Amino acid sequence: MHHQSSRAEALVLQTLYESGSLALEHMTERIPELSWSEVFHAIDRLSRKGDIVLRRRGFSYHLSLPTLSHV
C-alpha cells in the first residue's frame, strides 16, 4: 500500500512539474494508470504536506507547485 501511494504521489508531482498549474479533473486524465481515488488521495497527502497547493477557482479545483502558487 505504501509503495502504491508513494508511486501515486510521484506521478502527481511529475505531472505538475511538466504542466505547471492544472485543474483537478485534468490531473486524473493525465495519469490514466491510476484510479480517480488514487489520484485524489495522493493530492490530499501532498497538499497536507505542503508539497502542492490546492485552490478552488469557481466550481473547480486547481493544483500547482508551491513556487507557482502566486500565479
Task: Walk through the language-model features, giving the residues of each.
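Glycine-centered, phosphate/nucleic-acid-interacting loop/turn motifs that mediate DNA/RNA or nucleotide
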Residues: G50
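Short, cationic-aromatic polyanion-contact patches
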Residues: H3-S5, L54-V71
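Short amphipathic alpha-helical interface segments
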Residues: S5-R30
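A generic secondary-structure micro-motif detector
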Residues: H2, P32-E33
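Short amphipathic alpha-helical interaction segments
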Residues: L34-R45
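Proline- and acidic/polar-enriched loop/turn elements at helix boundaries
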Residues: T28, H41, G58-F59
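Phospho-regulated, low-complexity intrinsically disordered regions of nuclear gene-regulatory
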Residues: V12-T15, S37-V39, S64-V71
